[in-house]
Amino acid sequence: MAAQALVSSSLTSSVQTARQIFGSKPVASASQKKSSFVVKAAATPPVKQGANRPLWFASSQSLSYLDGSLPGDYGFDPLGLSDPEGTGGFIEPRWLAYGEIINGRFAMLGAAGAIAPEILGKAGLIPAETALPWFQTGVIPPAGTYTYWADNYTLFVLEMALMGFAEHRRLQDWYNPGSMGKQYFLGLEKGLAGSGNPAYPGGPFFNPLGFGKDEKSLKELKLKEVKNGRLAMLAILGYFIQGLVTGVGPYQNLLDHLADPVNNNVLTSLKFH
C-alpha cells in the first residue's frame, strides 16, 4: 500500500511538473466534461425602442442612431444629418429634431394663412381687395404690395424685432429649460415656465386645452404633429412653385383644375403638351 501511494504521488508530481513546463491545460475530470455539455438558455436581447415601426429607406448606419424614440422617426436619413459621429459638432442632432418641429408648426400656420384669404374672398366673407394671393400681400414686392397702415420697411423692422425677441426667448429656454419661468415678464412668467422639454412647453399659453393628458395620447399627438408639419412644409414649397409657374394662388389653381382637369394640370402648366 505504501509503495502504491508513493508511485501515485510520484506520478501526480511528474504530471504537474510537465504541465508547468509545457503550459498545457489541466485535464478536465469526468464530472467537469459532463457539465460542459449542459445547454444554457441564451439571454434574450433587449428590444429597441420603435423596433416594430415602419422604415423609410433606412440604412444600417441610420438605424444605429435613429432608434424610434423621436416622434415620426422611421430611420430615414439619407444625408446622415442626424448622425452624431459625422456632424463634427456643427449640427446638434437634438437641435435638428427640435428645428423640424418648430419649422413644421410655422409651416402649418403659413400654409393655412396663405390660402385662407383666397378661400374667404371667394366665399364673399371678406372684401375683394383683401382677398389676395399670398404673394401679392407684400411678401414679394415685385408681385404686388398691399397698402397697410405703415410702409413695408417699417413693418419689416417691426416684424424682425418681435420675432427676434420671441426666438431669443425660445433659444434661452433651449439652453436652460424652465428659465423663462424664473425671469419676470409682465406677470406671465408662471405660464412660460414650460415642462422641461423645450419642444413641448405646455402650460396655459402653449396647451390651453390640455391635450395629451396621458403618455399614450401625448405620444400619438406628437406623431400627428410631426406628420402634419412635414406635409405643411411640402405644401409651402408647392405654393412657391405654383405661384412662380401659374401666377395665381393655390386655391385658384385648384378651382381651375376642377373646372377643366384636362387643360389645367401639372403637365399643361409646365407646357409639357
Swiss-Prot record:
The modification Phosphoserine is found at S195. It is a multi-pass membrane protein. The chain crosses the membrane at residues 106-126, 146-166, 231-251. Chlorophyll a 4 binds at N228. Photoregulated by reversible phosphorylation of its threonine residues. Residues 1-39 form a transit peptide. Chlorophyll a 1 binds at F76, S82, E100, R230. Light emission at 715-720 nm upon excitation at 440 and 475 nm, and subsequent transfer of excitation energy to the photosystem I core with a relative slow rate of 25 nsec(-1). This is Photosystem I chlorophyll a/b-binding protein 3-1, chloroplastic. It comes from Arabidopsis thaliana (Mouse-ear cress). The gene is LHCA3.
